[in-house]
């Protein structure tokens, strides 16, 4: 492990020199690529430096315990020894986690599909709450968020299903833990007796696929057009700008109606289809390796109830790791950082256990 860490640090220093080279700076593609690699290594190098300092401090305090005759100095050395005896193993564990192989899709952009489940109008409203939550989370992360498809409910302002595209740094790696069934417990606006109702919405997070990831044959596609119910200026309900594409071999159907032209909607729909097919391919690879299937957090099993939002008690519970917070309003306002970090740490710990077990 330590040979690997030293190699990483050497590479980090090498990139640091290259990034100040005028020849590299003038080549924007190379500069961007090196800068991304540099950023990816910085956390490991920082943790490794901290580990080495702690290890040196532990050794020095140990030597002082044996050589120091002054009682006061010896007491200080003992305190340092006790502190670093705990700190060094913790930092070593952190390094092991940081050295875990990165998942192939983690650095990619993502599509998020939200569907209202059981609960009628209340489920549709909750689905809209989740959409707003993810939109605000995207804003907090500096990600770009675009609505690809939106199927309104006929009730109180919620929706049956919606699809958004998120673009930015490490989007899929951050959002993948949101896949699954989200349950809400609250008193609906239409409830006159004050009774708490339970509703649900499902979330699917898909990594965005590149053109070279998936080969799609034209003869496998069936494309239909229809009049859009979304934005589109004067074209709305007059021109068939909305597009629905069916991938015949898999039975997957995607639709897009948010753009102003049929061509734009077709391009967006193809992007959605490619991501869905890539997600299937990725899941098959993960199943073969049995890496992510070993951990319920990582699989994002869309049939599993993962989280409950209890409005009367302002409580959110993630059932996969037993995480509970009473900051429900903040969470719905896009402050998902604490809960996602807890899920990420749990996932890393489980992967490390699996690696050691193997």
Curated annotation (Swiss-Prot):
The keyword Lyase does not apply. One of its GO terms (cellular component) is cytoplasm. Keywords: Cytoplasm, Methylation, Protein biosynthesis. Gene3D superfamilies: 3.30.160.20, 3.30.70.1660, 6.10.140.1950. Methylated by PrmC. Methylation increases the termination efficiency of RF1. The keyword Coiled coil does not apply. SUPFAM superfamilies: Release factor. One of its GO terms (molecular function) is translation release factor activity, codon specific. It is found in: Cytoplasm. InterPro entries: PCRF (IPR005139), Pep_chain_release_fac_I (IPR000352), Pep_chain_release_fac_I_sf (IPR045853), Prokaryotic/Mito_RF (IPR050057), RF-1 (IPR004373). Peptide chain release factor 1 directs the termination of translation in response to the peptide chain termination codons UAG and UAA. NCBIfam families: prfA, PRK00591.1. Belongs to the prokaryotic/mitochondrial release factor family. This is Peptide chain release factor 1. It comes from Chloroherpeton thalassium (strain ATCC 35110 / GB-78). The gene is prfA.
